[in-house]
From Swiss-Prot:
Site (Important for catalytic activity): 331
Gene behind the chain: fumC
Listed EC numbers: 4.2.1.2
CDD domains found in the cross-reference section: Fumarase_classII
Name used for this protein in its record: Fumarate hydratase class II
Active site: 187, 318
InterPro entries registered for this protein in UniProt: Fum_hydII, Fumarase/histidase_N, Fumarase_C_C, Fumarate_lyase_CS, Fumarate_lyase_fam, Fumarate_lyase_N, L-Aspartase-like
Amino acid sequence: MSDFMTEQEFRIEHDTMGEVKVPAKALWQAQTQRAVENFPISGRGLESAQIRAMGLLKAACAQVNKDSGALDAEKADAIIAAGKEIASGKHDAEFPIDVFQTGSGTSSNMNTNEVIASIAKANGVEVHPNDHVNMGQSSNDTFPTATHVAATEAAVNDLIPGLKVLHESLAKKANEWSEVVKSGRTHLMDAVPVTLGQEFGGYARQIQLGIERVEATLPRLGELAIGGTAAGTGINTSADFGGKVVAELINLTDVKELKEAENHFEAQAARDALVEFSGAMRVIAVSLYKIANDIRLMGSGPLTGLGEIRLPDLQPGSSIMPGKVNPVLCETATQVSAQVIGNDAAVAFSGTQGQFELNVFIPVMARNVLESARLLANTSRVFATRLVDGIEPNEAHMKELAESSPSIVTPLNSAIGYEAAAKVAKTALAEGKTIRQTVIDLGLVDGEKLTEEELDKRLDVLAMAHTERENKF
């Protein structure tokens, strides 16, 4: 970058390695610029949620250092104000370092320190990125702390609420369609009747279990490494620093699930809680794929597909075929599922990279975990409000398919036997007749084992779908 900058476009900054040319208007300084030049890899930086968490963390640390007397009030207040500015998203463009950087996140920690120092200077207060902004801290405890703050915030404020919107939408449809009968399908082949409500109740239960899985990770996800400094021992800070910073973070975020790590060596050397959280999101992605794919298949058509439900028309589906409308949100959801599952694979492997006192794959773990949470939260809301809420069932068509399915012969097993029932199914299919007519034609209504009244009762497709047990969703 610096090779192309003119005299007017850059300024000279320095660090312990010497002078560096930095863009004149940039708030970052020397160490950030070195990282920008060292890591021109993907063009993707940190998630905004992580930048926010870094800003809040620096503000919290400054407040604790001010309260203890370690940092004078003027400098501390300048750092706090700058940290909150960063947390607001105002300075996201000042965080240019690629996600594929040093595995501890040191570059991004220093990026935060330098931007805060520059904001403070612009407001008339001189603070040093290391001596003041980073006081009592190390990249090895700040970056994982910010990652867990951001992930916990994402889970509590975005992901869980988004999933609850989807669950409510699916559960509403489950209740609404409790008497809408259709053919069940196993192996993509006709099976005994179910109701559309039962299917959507199953989907709602999947999402509810996903919510519970995420909630179950929070006690570990909310543990913060701050206070461990370089290697977990807390060198260069006080024993109560971590706990006090966490208390400040709770005040700043209103996320009550945050707490100081119970073991600072585990909190810096391992990222198991991120792996666990990512795993919970992977399960949700698998659930979402199944739900979206089922809905897409049920809505296929309009003439040559299943045509059991009508999906909302959201946008034209083809640049060449007039009038075509596609299941775009089903395809969106399934693509998101693929991305989240892929992200989880990277997170799981990255979790293995904790050698001795530090995991050194944290930036990519943070990016993937936060992206997965954002994708699932947004997709859940949109899928619910723009798709599920607008689905209309084709009740007559579904009932017709259910009644024509060979599998409705199943309740006749106890009256005529399995082999005779199988013959009925095959004959009806081969001759294009209903199961009822085939039973009569084969002389199986004998007035003893099976009467015509009993036959009609056993072939009531809605009655077949009803179950005595309660199914929670």
